[in-house]
Swiss-Prot record:
Keyword Cytoplasm annotated: yes
Classification lineage: Bacteria, Pseudomonadati, Pseudomonadota, Gammaproteobacteria, Pseudomonadales
Keyword hit for Protein biosynthesis: yes
EC number(s) on file: 6.1.1.20
Oligomer status and interactors: Tetramer of two alpha and two beta subunits.
Single GO term (MF): phenylalanine-tRNA ligase activity
Protein name, entry field: Phenylalanine--tRNA ligase alpha subunit
Domain of life: Bacteria
Cofactor annotation remark: Binds 2 magnesium ions per tetramer.
Entry's localization field: Cytoplasm
Catalytic activity: tRNA(Phe) + L-phenylalanine + ATP = L-phenylalanyl-tRNA(Phe) + AMP + diphosphate + H(+)
Endpoints of the signal sequence: none
Length: 338
């Protein structure tokens, strides 16, 4: 057993001299591994008398345990020192700002539509929607647009066949509402519409909001007051507004609505073509023929209607000079509206 004590002393001294974890691992293999010196001593038990084996085996196991405990303690000390050194080298300044997350925002056209809807719902209007693929009757015939009208031409309208087309305005929603609802009616109809047109101020697809009010004793003064108040709230400023006589098949009388140029305050600029005025919408009193075709008696009820392009209003509100920018999906442009 003197040899066993000597092996234990050698092992413990080797552990004390070890400079790193790799050295400790080598010591473990030399003394406790399958071919280690203490393991080899255990294999000599078979050469001893049977009555001595338990006592000697216990001594060998005790020796291995002593070496294992010291070796593990030394290894833990190395690991703790290594961790402390790494933490010191990787010091984190917890006062630094965190990484921000990219956030999205509402599209300027969506913002514009919501702004329009918010005003009209606040004064008692409802929101009405309808199909974008329309039939000829609701898109033209029911709106007092005869077969020879230029709007029915192939170069202005996207046709699927002789009777089905992509709606050119949201007016069919008004017709469907009048057919299914008894007056009084107060609705705005936002939605996508389609026309064969594409340039700096036009797109083959754009967003339109039309409004309709049907009730007894409605006159042009009601229409005028509604539109003037809407424009004041939408642009958040007092603007001069004028109504120019115009013609639409579905309204009589009809008018185009102009506002004082928001770019030059009416002094004349490139945007308003030096006139000081900008056209923003069309409007008028609902034509008696439209009321009759929808099953409403024009002798009892009257109404007004108006329509505006959301892109047009967004361009004026945000100072955008090219309508196509709204649909280019350029994040540099869209990020300005967050």
């Amino acid at each position: 057993m003197e040899n066993l004590d000597a092996l234990v002393s050698q092992a413990l001294e080797a552990v004390e001299r070890a400079e790193d974890i790799n050295a400790l691992e080598q010591i473990r293999v030399n003394y406790l591994g399958k071919k280690g010196e203490l393991t080899q001593v255990m294999k000599t038990l078979g050469n001893l008398p049977a009555e001595e084996r338990p006592k000697v085996g216990a001594l060998i196991n005790d020796a291995k345990e002593r070496v294992t405990v010291v070796l593990n303690a030394r290894k833990a000390a190395f690991e703790e020192a290594e961790l402390s050194a790494r933490l010191a080298a990787e010091c984190i300044d917890v006062t630094l700002p965190g990484r921000g997350q990219a956030t999205g925002g509402l599209h300027p056209i969506t913002r514009t539509l919501e702004r329009i809807e918010q005003f009209f719902t606040h004064i008692g209007y409802g929101i009405a929607e309808g199909p974008e693929v329309e039939d000829d009757y609701h898109n033209f015939e029911a709106l007092n647009i005869p077969g020879h009208h230029p709007a029915r031409a192939m170069h202005d309208t996207f046709y699927f066949n002789a009777n089905m087309l992509l709606r050119t305005h949201t007016s069919p929603v008004q017709v469907r509402t009048m057919e299914s609802t008894q007056p009084p009616i107060r609705i705005v109809c936002p939605g996508r519409v389609y026309r064969c047109d594409s340039d700096i101020t036009h797109s083959p697809m754009f967003h339109q909001v039309e409004g309709l009010l049907i009730d007894r004793d409605i006159n042009f003064a009601d229409l005028k007051g509604t539109i003037e108040e809407f424009l004041r709230v939408f642009f958040e400023k007092e603007l001069a507004v004028r109504f120019r006589p115009s013609f639409f098949p579905f309204t009589e009388p009809s008018a185009e609505v102009d506002i004082q140029c928001v770019m030059c305050s009416g002094n004349g600029c490139r945007v308003c073509k030096q006139t000081g005025w900008l056209e923003v919408m069309g409007c008028g009193m609902v034509h008696p023929n439209v009321l009759r075709m929808s099953g409403i008696d024009p002798e009892e009820f009257q109404g007004f209607a108006f329509g505006m392009g959301a892109e047009r209003l967004a361009m004026l509100r945000y100072g955008v000079n090219d309508l196509r920018l709204f649909f280019d999906n350029d994040l540099r442009f869209l990020a300005q509206f967050r």
